[in-house]
Amino acid sequence: MYVYDEYDQRIIEDRVKQFRDQTRRYLAGELSEEEFRPLRLQNGLYIQRFAPMLRVAVPYGQLNARQVRTLAKIARDYDKGYAHISTRQNVQFNWPALEDVPDILAELATVQMHAIQTSGNCLRNTTTDQFAGVAADEIIDPRPWCEIVRQWTTFHPEFAYLPRKFKIAINGSQEDRAAIEVHDIGLEPVRNAAGELGFRVLVGGGLGRTPVVGSFINEFLPWQDLISYLDAILRVYNRYGRRDNKYKARIKILVKALTPEVFAEKVEAEMVHLRGGSTTLTEAEVQRVSRHFVDPDYLALDNVDYSALDAGYPGFARWRSRNTRAHKRPGYVAVTLSLKPTGVAPGDLTDKQLDAVADLAERYSFGFLRTSHEQNIILADVEQRQLHALWLELREAGFATPNIGLLTDIICCPGGDYCSLANAKSIPIAESIQRRFDDLDYLFDIGEIDLNISGCMNACGHHHVGHIGILGVDKKGEEFYQVSLGGNAARGASLGKILGPSFAQDDMADVIEKLIAVYVEQRTEEERFIDTYQRIGIDPFKERVYAANH
């Protein structure tokens, strides 16, 4: 995990001092709301429905136990005892008082954390695979590259006021767990015929009001040119991106308007001036960053045969089958802590749970943990021989729901319960579906399904790329929900198709049940929901859901 140097620390401490003075001036009436707005947004502070919301940066989802304990303290002292994991791996507090935010930022700074560039029209947090560095299918560890990008993006003077917000994701594995195809820029490693490392570069992906699957504009970018090429992309976007209409200001609109081919030509024209210049990466620079991401002190361990434990503890066997993932090292396993038990808002943790997570990380995973864009937590380096003991502790702490990748592992934005932009509540819909599908035997029989819920068209819940997507809409002051099918955020991403007219809140669990019934009836052996949908199309689902008396 990257450790700040003196320069990094001074940056965030200076920012705290600046924002403390800006907040004081605003509260004293010396700054107008219009003047204060860009200042608070630069520090991750939104004004929500009932209170400010502070979004804390978690670079590429990496945390240590000390940082998590600080988050627990903030939740306890300044919030209502809760924190929320966002779909871009950050942490949000939904109830801080405005006058307390400078103190919160000061506490974050003591553990090398901040809220810089977590909002506003700037370069946001770079995200990646939650199993980066330990995945068995990994091509390269993407974390050093994420950190290189983070350092380049932080306080970049040319890109502080872009036409619109800008998000970068980097994948390092054969499977795309970073959803790179629906980001403004997506990067994935590739090697040429000579075995040299480079990146495939995608631009113009994104969700929100106008969802788009991005386009690859460079099939092999030498790693030395990575930052120069990103710089060139941002220069083109900054120059040609629209600023007269925020709904048409994202880079995806520009790429579509120009065509990917013309956009790539403009990027290459910028590269004529940048290639070989000061932004060219060197081996020494990559090594400087990479040394922060060396493996922990793994032991030489054999893989464990769990057959006896599985037979004696069926609950453990079920949990192990869903909530663990193969590790690159023998004798180790990556464990996902589910934040989706029935009756709990997806992605929420209490202050006590945060403290418990920190303790578990120290005992079982070298003191480190990760957040995922699916709004769960990962202990990436658990000894297989300790897995049963960990499971027992996770049950006590409320983290052992065996539903990772299943229907109730719902991605869900805070929705109308918190967000001033939402058209409808999201959390009650998630809870009603969780309660309807609370039978674990049936849940396991259904198999893998991505169900994503957004409270408005901004798509913070990624509903466009859910196998089943739910979007909250407003109909004459009443909350309704539009359903889409067939979305996919993995490799070969696709956007869901709208099923038909929207549904009332009370009908949503029934609607999902009917969709699942069609899948169960139509599936072939080992076929997932998305596979069945792709084979039979949307019509059988539509006919069942809208049938008058079915």
Where are these regions (language model features)?
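Peripheral terminal and linker regions in Fe-S/redox and tRNA-modifying enzymes
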Residues: 1-550
